[in-house]
Amino acid sequence: MTHPGVYLSLRICWPISVDQPAAAAHLTENLNVAFELYQVRTGDGLKPLARNGLAAEGTREAVGIEIRQTIDLCRSEKGRVMRNNAQHLKLQFAKAWEDDGMARQEIRKFLHTYTSTLL
């Protein structure tokens, strides 16, 4: 379990502030590679979320129930699907950094644009 920073391998997101709620939403709603905890929210975070209407109770009991349910989901078919999705993303990232991959091509263009003038 971790905050959903973009450089971490995630499974269960506990978003706190700044970019973390958006990252958690992307990982859970768009990529389907992580679970997000809602009951850990406090303050304004207890309001219903615009994207799915879920509102947190924010109690210790609700947090405990949600964590146990999330662990069960990690072990379920839904968890298996998420692991498969994460594996697929891993392969896409690896392919992007191969010699002819998109990421490699883009970094070469960037370096050519901004370093060729320095030589």
What residue ranges belong to the model's regions?
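Catalytic core of nucleotide-sugar-dependent glycosyltransferases
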Residues: M1-L119
